[in-house]
Amino acid sequence: MCSSDLGAFSAAANTITITAYTYPVRGIVNKALLFTKTAFAAAGLTALHFTATVAGNDILSLHNGLAAGAVTQANEASAGGYLGYVWSMSATTALTVTATSAGALLNALTAGELELYLETAQLPAP
């Protein structure tokens, strides 16, 4: 599990991307889940979405950051087939989470906590 409070997403912009997890060499993520533990808030904020991406491929998208308790999940049968995939046999690979807001910049956030849960595995060395 990776948990991030509003500080990780603080930027004088409407979009920011952070590295939330680094796949090990021969790493696999079989399941992924985003959970809004505490709703994000800011004056004028009308929308806040989170997207989890690996190597430019969305595995979770349009997760609602304004609703406490919101859950977005994916497994091998969903997420465009990008879960259960070995990204590299020789290098680590980053899983990023992008926050995109409307109505307020991300540095105006006054509350919020997002949790990322991953079911991972690693192939043995050849």
How would you describe each model-predicted region?
Residues V29-K31:
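Hydrophobic residues on conserved beta-strands that form the core of alpha/beta folds
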Residues A102-P126:
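C-terminal interaction-tip segments
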Residues G7-R26, T36-Y82, A91, A99-L109:
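Surface-exposed ligand/attachment interfaces on beta-rich extracellular proteins
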Residues Y85-V86:
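Detector for the mature cores of small, proteolytically processed
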Residues M1-S3:
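Short, small-residue-biased leader/transition segments that mark boundaries at the very start
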Residues L34-A39, A121-L123:
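Solvent-exposed strand-to-loop "edge" motifs in beta-rich extracellular domains
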